Design a protein with these regions (language model features):
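Short, solvent-exposed loop/turn segments at the edges of secondary structure
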Residues: 48-50, 116, 311
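A residue-level signal for conserved active-site and pocket-lining positions in enzyme catalytic cores
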Residues: 87, 168, 303
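A gly/proline- and charged-residue-enriched helix-loop-helix capping module
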Residues: 48-96
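Short, high-confidence coil segments that cap the C-terminus of an alpha-helix
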Residues: 16-18, 79-82, 270, 277-279
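Aromatic (often tryptophan-rich) hydrophobic motifs at membrane interfaces
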Residues: 22-24, 34-35, 68-72, 201-320
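A conserved beta-strand-loop-helix scaffold within acyl/acetyltransferase catalytic domains
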Residues: 1-28, 32-43, 90-248
């Protein structure tokens, strides 16, 4: 996943004291595992600046050695003056192969406690469930309005002046300020920096009302009604941000957008032009607040209406 790439982690290096680790086996020079992490006082967190962290291993990782590895990590952290570890485990949909040896080690070696459980909604692309009535009704409204969708190409000469990005970011910010009295985790400038570093992995998809000819003969610009920022991380397409304007919400803009994404952009693999395309899952992201204690029922209803079902994002803690 590109989230563990230095080009992504370092965009907010001023906010986190890096404590990431490269792990090699004794007597072997090959890299065995990675652990993105930062330190805050006497606490290690993997990772506070990411949706998830956790141990990243290859096919050589086996249960007994991963248990031994956590024993050595704990000893190393104690020697560094660390007294607490916060571990945001990688959800299983991001694994290229089964790799939950770390979770076993957390309970058996670290005696960790599950402190946060949040729920996301994910679609298995090759086995989609039926779309709900609400999404179907929204799609009919959008088609009646003749709405269109497009994937925004990265234009380095535009950067923060890209009209599609600016329009979407205003919609997103307005929604967050109005509903949650907060702002996006990223600024538009930060997001465009990341898009420039990972143009194939971070994409913006928008739904819009096409330009129309006015009575005086002039043409109005396309009106952006909603969109989503997509993170393409190996086999998972993850929606990092989703937003629609009040007008977009009233005319089914997001219903149109996700219908287009799931059926035209990321169809079942047997329908794809590039057969080796690895994408397996479409993840709508979490629908919880307050460390998982509050479930946003209207938000998860919309995601489940497209056939999304639960994948948990878990956080563990233990004392040293």
């Amino acid at each position: 996943t590109f989230l563990f790439n230095r080009g992504y982690l370092d965009y907010h290096s001023d906010r986190f004291q890096d404590a990431s680790l490269l792990i090699r086996r004794h007597g072997k020079g090959r890299l065995y595992a990675l652990l993105p992490a930062h330190r805050k006082g006497g606490t290690i967190c993997s990772h506070g600046g990411l949706t998830y962290g956790g141990l990243l291993t290859g096919s050589e990782a086996k249960a007994a050695y991963v248990c031994k590895l956590f024993e050595e990590l704990n000893a190393y952290w104690r020697a560094q003056g660390i007294h607490k570890v916060v571990y945001k485990a990688m959800p299983w949909i991001y694994h290229r192969q089964p790799a939950q040896e770390d979770l076993y080690a957390l309970t058996q070696i670290c005696h960790a406690s599950l402190t946060v459980r949040e729920i996301s909604s994910t679609i298995l692309i090759d086995s989609k469930l039926k779309v709900g009535d609400s999404a179907k009704n929204g799609l009919r409204k959008a088609r009646k309005r003749n709405l269109r969708c497009r994937m925004v190409d990265y234009r380095p000469e535009k950067q923060c002046d890209d009209p599609d990005w600016k329009a979407f970011w205003k919609i997103l910010t307005d929604n967050l300020v109005m509903v949650h009295h907060t702002h996006p985790v990223h600024t538009l400038e930060e997001m465009m920096l990341l898009v420039g570093r990972f143009p194939e992995a971070i994409r913006l998809a928008v739904v819009y009302e096409p330009e129309t000819q006015q009575p005086d003969g002039t043409c109005s610009d396309d009106v952006i009604l909603g969109g989503t920022v997509l993170y393409l991380t190996g086999q998972v397409v993850h929606t990092q941000y989703i937003a629609a304007s009040p007008e977009g919400k009233s005319c089914g803009a997001l219903d149109m957008l996700f219908h287009w994404l799931l059926n035209d952009c990321f169809p079942e693999r047997q329908q794809r032009c590039v057969k080796e395309d690895p994408i397996l899952y479409f993840d709508f992201g979490k629908s919880t607040e307050d460390a998982g204690h509050y479930l946003n029922s209207s938000l998860i209803f919309q995601k489940e209406g497209f056939g999304g079902r639960g994948v948990c994002y878990d956080t563990y803690e233990w004392e040293l």
